[in-house]
């Protein structure tokens, strides 16, 4: 084996061993110490991050494209299934970022969940969640990818429903599973089609063998899978509902694991899509609709976690647009930069919520730049990075995506929606900054504000460095397969920045204006549309089940019971026997003359018959 390949393989196996050791310890009969979460789980992730830097530095210094390590797992007559790990610039760059972000989240969780009696189990779930995502990222075949895919799905169910004493948490966990089941159907159907027509689940072999095949059907299945997992329009309601889970779960779910898995699947499969206009157009339109719709929903939310959740869905829509542009490397760049500031925004939200007696309504916050200056600073940096402020992490990916959209020969509808959504991003980001950090406090004076804890400060500090410099570092080291357009008109170059500034100014004006309310209620229709999340949950969770139940009741009670069973059962027999019974009963009228006449007629007939 080549030394470089040996280095990659041994690093990955060592990383998995370090992460799996704390999990295996939990299966023993020995009770875990109270500090197991910080001494084992957090340390394991930190060590794995440091180990992952070795293959990353080697990869960047040697300029290698990809290394694959395979072990035969199962051999059948038509299909070989291998345990195969792929080291390319997607997995090599993403794994350290995922570990870095998770390390910060786990350290924060030691403070956030310190009073939970089952904190060790919580950390075990988080660690399993991370391992499943790393399996998905490093998989070189669809079967192995599917194991990671299902792993993040089931762990999200357990983590979202962590506080299972609350009905809302159970409902949210069930929603996450059911919506993801729809996506899983797409992935399974796509895998079945590929196994039938290509006879391989190995990613490289699929790319080679499928060149002369029409790949529309399996690609539609993969897009459905990504729609469910990455909460695209139509299968998106589970994502804001998932905020019922603890804040560290939300941070991990939205930054570097669950929701980016769908986009990562499409990035992995992008060579299958690059010549399929149906799939690319569908991704483009679906992403544009998602980013616009969820940004609109975020405008009027008052729950700080739900605003950040909708911003995630909006950014996932932007990544889907990028895949529709046939620029998967830009989508990957946005995944990497987005992980830093999105995790930081959630951790800041968790810090604020804990400091204000579990208050999540931004209207009941304010003035935190005096009381919690570090958290407020990180919240501001994260919101500005999300907006695409120049030279913060989000700028490098977001600006490149909108430039690519501006210079592509695609429909202007997607471009328009994306630019409006970018402006809306600036509006709700500034709204969070304005209501949470600025002005005067609007909460009870007894709130135990305390950010002077290393378990709060250190994770935020690390993620803030990532939010400031992460975009530049990833941008300098990522290999862009396609050369971007190097010349363009100034108005196109400045379009993303212009709409962001416009959004910021609009938000500032609106926030200042609405600090004194002139009307009793806002404009009913647009406000109601945004607050009710576009009426999608009402239609999917209320109208459709109500229609199904009503239809079922009508079929069961009226059509089957009152119509079919009545007409063919008791009533049918009664209707058949009634004429005969009526004719028979008419003959017995109680008149002696009639009876004597009938008797005589019968006697005559019998005599005649016997005589013959």
Swiss-Prot record:
Regions that span the bilayer: 12-32, 48-68, 92-112, 117-137, 142-162, 176-196, 247-267, 279-299, 307-327, 330-350, 376-396, 419-439, 463-483, 494-514, 591-611
Recorded catalytic activity of this chain's protein: a ubiquinone + NADH + 5 H(+)(in) = a ubiquinol + NAD(+) + 4 H(+)(out)
Keywords associated with the record: Electron transport, Membrane, Mitochondrion, Mitochondrion inner membrane, NAD, Respiratory chain, Translocase, Transmembrane, Transmembrane helix, Transport, Ubiquinone
Broad class of enzyme this protein falls into: translocase
Membrane topology: Multi-pass membrane protein
Keyword ATP-binding: no
Homology family: Belongs to the complex I subunit 5 family.
Free-text function comment from the UniProt entry: Core subunit of the mitochondrial membrane respiratory chain NADH dehydrogenase (Complex I) that is believed to belong to the minimal assembly required for catalysis. Complex I functions in the transfer of electrons from NADH to the respiratory chain. The immediate electron acceptor for the enzyme is believed to be ubiquinone.
Annotated protein name in UniProt: NADH-ubiquinone oxidoreductase chain 5
